[in-house]
């Protein structure tokens, strides 16, 4: 398939900035990190990081990776991984379709190990992630859903068996933790209805509600971003 891509001209901490995939669902702005060792002779892992509101494109080029560390911390877990940090335009269906289009482009354009395709979404990016995993859960090996809620459906996720790690502060100032806790409980119920054991469910769905002490008394919705430095969480994602 032919793709129309405008390459960026500036770099930031190893990322080629503001590439544009001109797609049927609009122009998709994204920053791209390709390890120097990549030469197409060996399939690499792929990771996409969906930003919160502060990282959307209208906030300015690069605000996503200047305010969130997921794309940089990920490099510590696999030195053979291509990383894309899209700057989306909203946290709804448009951004979900654009995330899927970008993923499909990257899978076609680069030598990617289809068994190592990861994604995370923080805040509004988590809402987008829930829609992505409703539409095309089979594209991804595992997902990290950070400080957000689930706007999508769960049945497609159950059918695809895509593992999801939900993490949020117990008193998240924007979303609270009750809604995503209910989502997790419903997801587990659906897996039980499919006949899965508790051990099997535990490998597919994790709920990690951080207490006040974890934040040191500070802001929880913004402070949750430091899970990008939490080895337990990140190894769960990239160990799949």
Model feature map: region roles:
Residues 42-43, 57-63, 96-97, 131-132, ...:
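Short, solvent-exposed loop/turn and secondary-structure capping segments
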Residues 52-56, 88-93, 123-127, 148-152, ...:
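Solvent-exposed loop/turn segments at secondary-structure junctions
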Residues 44-100:
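Active-site machinery of serine-nucleophile hydrolases
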Residues 108-109, 115-159:
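Primarily recognizes the serine-hydrolase "nucleophile elbow" in alpha/beta-hydrolase
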Residues 37-42, 91-123:
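Gly/Ser-rich "nucleophile elbow"/oxyanion-hole loop immediately N-terminal to the catalytic nucleophile
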Residues 1-46, 127, 131-132, 191-205, ...:
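A domain-start/cap signature at the N-terminus of enzymes
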Residues 165-167, 173-175, 181, 190-240:
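C-terminal catalytic histidine-bearing segment of alpha/beta-hydrolase fold enzymes
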Residues 79, 158-164:
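Short, proline-enriched alpha-helix->beta-strand connector loops that line the catalytic pocket
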